[in-house]
């Protein structure tokens, strides 16, 4: 869904931690981040600590915050939950927090993605193949 939105001109920004908690999962994350970059989205690596938040903000009107990774595994197998917030003030505050966090992040560019090492590419592809199990 994020790739489709980015390809249609929606401003899609993804923030991931710069330090992995699990290397295998992080490799899969970088692979999927590359797909978003190719679709026209932007990816940032948060440098000021470990970022584990899962939040989505849309149009300054709606926000989704919680523990789920926004995938079927999180919702069906792990029984994680998110809160849908239909409050403009809260959605705008969350967007403002995200924009402040960008200042503590580095942009991960399409050029960086395309110029990664062969070893990194292999790790990402193997991790991506197994990502439904992660």
Residue ranges of model-derived segments:
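PLD/PLD-like phosphodiesterase catalytic module centered on the HKD motif
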Residues: 1-134
